[in-house]
From Swiss-Prot:
It holds the Pfam family SUS_N. Belongs to the glycosyltransferase 1 family. Plant sucrose synthase subfamily. Transmembrane segments: none annotated. It comes from Oryza sativa subsp. japonica (Rice). Residues 280-757 are annotated as: GT-B glycosyltransferase. One of its GO terms (biological process) is sucrose metabolic process. Its EC number is 2.4.1.13. Sucrose-cleaving enzyme that provides UDP-glucose and fructose for various metabolic pathways. This is Sucrose synthase 3. GO terms for molecular function: sucrose synthase activity. InterPro entries: Glyco_trans_1, Sucrose_synth_GT-B1, Sucrose_synthase_pln/cyn, SUS_EPBD, SUS_N. Gene3D superfamilies: 1.20.120.1230, 3.10.450.330, Glycogen Phosphorylase B.
Amino acid sequence: MGETTGERALTRLHSMRERIGDSLSAHTNELVAVFSRLVNQGKGMLQPHQIIAEYNAAIPEGEREKLKDSALEDVLRGAQEAIVIPPWIALAIRPRPGVWEYLRINVSQLGVEELSVPEYLQFKEQLVDGSTQNNFVLELDFEPFNASFPRPSLSKSIGNGVQFLNRHLSSKLFHDKESMYPLLNFLRAHNYKGMTMMLNDRIRSLDALQGALRKAEKHLAGITADTPYSEFHHRFQELGLEKGWGDCAQRVRETIHLLLDLLEAPEPSALEKFLGTIPMVFNVVILSPHGYFAQANVLGYPDTGGQVVYILDQVRAMENEMLLRIKQQGLNITPRILIVTRLLPDAHGTTCGQRLEKVLGTEHTHILRVPFRTENGTVRKWISRFEVWPYLETYTDDVAHEISGELQATPDLIIGNYSDGNLVACLLAHKLGVTHCTIAHALEKTKYPNSDLYWKKFEDHYHFSCQFTADLIAMNHADFIITSTFQEIAGNKETVGQYESHMAFTMPGLYRVVHGIDVFDPKFNIVSPGADMSIYFPFTESQKRLTSLHLEIEELLFSDVENTEHKFVLKDKKKPIIFSMARLDHVKNLTGLVELYGRNPRLQELVNLVVVCGDHGKESKDKEEQAEFKKMFNLIEQYNLNGHIRWISAQMNRVRNGELYRYICDMRGAFVQPALYEAFGLTVIEAMTCGLPTFATAYGGPAEIIVHGVSGYHIDPYQNDKASALLVEFFEKCQEDPNHWIKISQGGLQRIEEKYTWKLYSERLMTLSGVYGFWKYVTNLDRRETRRYLEMLYALKYRKMATTVPLAIEGEASTK
């Protein structure tokens, strides 16, 4: 798990062991005091906050000052978990993001030893099976396949994969004239449905290419910058140059200059810019099978939330960028984007039963729905995202057939979303030999603590054996991985990233992951999305405000009627509102928000609470949602919150939701996102884009989106009293100084403009697709060895596990 090679990792681990050994002689009493307290906890696993609590309890504050910067403090503060099996304590230590070390301490004998990853995982497994049997266990290790592959070594390089890749491979590939031939071949291979682009058969060598480019340059010097390509098309064909260089003389000249500069003195940023200007992506397929995927009346249905919004906004921005690039390249090609999702015959008033649906606000983007099927025919009912695994292989074959018919071509890029979409994208890209991009949105392993170690307890309901295996396969197969934040990859100083948690873990009785993913891998790229600016815009833009919706919004918030759309009534309708909107599930933690509000009488004096989640009109079939529904009612009754809270059913009208955010801005309220973990935080972006001061979880993406105290606030969902105190402090300060609310509102808007817009996103995604497509063509970046290993894992492990997931019983009611 070292930073570069196994040898360096061992050196570092050994030095850590020596430092602990030195501390034993220098601070024996303190070490004994701390580790004895840990061992006295008995067999089990301790989390970081528990380890630090025991350290603080064992060592008086004055003595702790003397231990600052000691090996003991470094180890305890860097420990992400402690496995206690008396008299042993094993520690997983994380000196910095992406770098791990493992130690085991015998508290009776005060002995310290380093552990390899398999040794640590084997020790950890004793918490489950209680034995130390050395029976052969399947170990998954992807590191040998990447041993000769370039990777950065600094944590700050994580998520900037394309820059590193260009830098490294440019120097390796373009070191002399002969090494430039792959670039020539790449340009010669460019075509679309039989139409030759960039170069024709007249150019067969680098000398011929450079000669043609210089002649073209000379020709362009004699015509005006705005001369259309069509006017010198025939001359260029004679030189061996085809369409794709640009739509006018000026743009063609710029592209030719870029290539000439590359041929003479390769430079990474110039290479990236050149690859971003040439035609490469015309047909894109986006996979998102689960849930109810449609453009209206679905948000709030089970498994249907931010991912749907993300993809619909994504494709609008992508189509605009593709059309712009194709025009600038001087081509007359119609791009196509297909969002492939599941067709639901039991569509419940949505368009989910419609095979093909055009995406509003686009010209060439459609939702293509393909049903799940078994040997008994089409599956009609909605299926939880945790139960889709038996259907996906057949689904992939059906999707391949459908997209071939729709596109009449092979896609240039396949993008997967979430675990099921990523697995289908992986199988499809593998089958078609297409560039494959993965977007996780959320990796469930990080949302459910210890769901790997105790996977058997979760298996009947969640089937994590299938899901975690699918995640491993997809992330290792992908040509590039897009994340919204650094946190998603490698967390921060205190918390472990989603992908980082897949570096090493164990599922006792199934397999042991010795090296699952490398967060330093240059396939990782941070590309942050935004909000749809036509819907979400600042509350201060009065000319765009949808004031015609205010009566509806006031009815929603303040009417004294309780019905299937809203429960409970607000007494004081003048108070500011704390607002939250999310799916009603355990991880989104809206019940936690209600509880922290209920436990703080001062907060109730200052503000009302409005939560939007669930559906009062229909009983959910989702077990987790049912449990949270019941818990919400119990909390409202327990804390006597009627009069202070409004519980509104999930709202599917995004346009009205945008004005709802702005209406709450008018009331000088705030948005709170209290999730136990949030991969990104699209509602955080939406609220901030409207100018609503935002308080969001410190766990996951929002910690990166928000600069604490400047553009919003971080809250710890595990420390309700501190979170509610922060809210009280904010609203009291706003009462004293109304400009404080404005200051935080403007700070949020500025943050969005700088980093979180769909235009920036689409430009970056198209460039990444071109760059990785190029490197895949000219090098061994397609990682054939890894993919053969993945085929074996899929065939021998995943397929068998998928058969254990029960198929849907069609006779049951299929409602949400």
